[in-house]
Amino acid sequence: MQHQVAIITGAASGLGFAIAKQLSALGVQLALLDINTSALQENIAAFGTTPAIFEVDITNEVAVKQTIDMIAAQFGKIDILVNSAGITGITNTKSDATSTENIRAVFDVNFMGSYFTSKYVIPVMLPKKYGRILHIGSIAGKEGNAGMLAYSASKAAVIAMAKVQGKEYAETGITVNAIAPAVIRTAMHDTMPVEQLNYMTDKIPMKRCGTLQELANMVCFIVSPQNSFTTGFTFDLSGGRATY
């Protein structure tokens, strides 16, 4: 994977940061996107290769297009896109008490952000007849978590998008997949109510959270050249929770 170019959204922390570190260790050139890049600037020494850092709001379609145009011009290609930016929104709230504003805010980041990046990366990949796109879904998108309507529905939409795009570009050399983790311990989950986190963890047969390293290891395989005959698929990383 040396000399490949990867865009990673939500790269300043959590899943995105772990994935970026692992890809960097494999010699991948990184274009890291986040709305708050101060943490990336502070931790730039963690990467084996010097990343290009872009401050961008992925809910802003114009800004996303401009950023991807800059990345394509700077590197001359884009081989990998990992959409790891995501928010949970307000949780531990039943559907009748969930605000419309919360639903829209979560969908804007989790679904529309992933749609915008893939929309503008795919035309860069097509002439090269190669690309790896990975949308970060969630087990909540497959099974639904009570009290998390916005998050669960947005991740279900992300999984559906991977299925559609996988079929649409199956003959182009571009693969589009998703991954559906159960609880991976990150700062995002530290902000959840204890009851909500326990509800999620209790459903995992291994009775533990996944680790960022476990996630990064699987992601690096999914976006590698070795993973060449799987597209439109949602990979499981749930400690045995997934039933399909």
Identify the role of each PLM range.
Residues S138:
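Residue(s) in the substrate-gating loop at a strand-loop-helix junction
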Residues N92-S95, S99-F107, H189, M200:
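Substrate-binding pocket helix/loop in short-chain dehydrogenase/reductase
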Residues S118, S154, A162:
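Active-site helix of classical SDR
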Residues Q2-L30:
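Canonical Rossmann dinucleotide-binding motif of NAD(H)/NADP(H)-dependent dehydrogenases/reductases
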Residues N92, E143, C220, T231-Y244:
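Short C-terminal tail/terminal secondary-structure segment
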Residues P123, K167-E171:
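Alpha-helical segment proximal to the catalytic Tyr-Lys
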Residues A170, T175, T230-G232:
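Short, small/polar-rich loop/turn modules that mediate ligand/substrate recognition or access, typified
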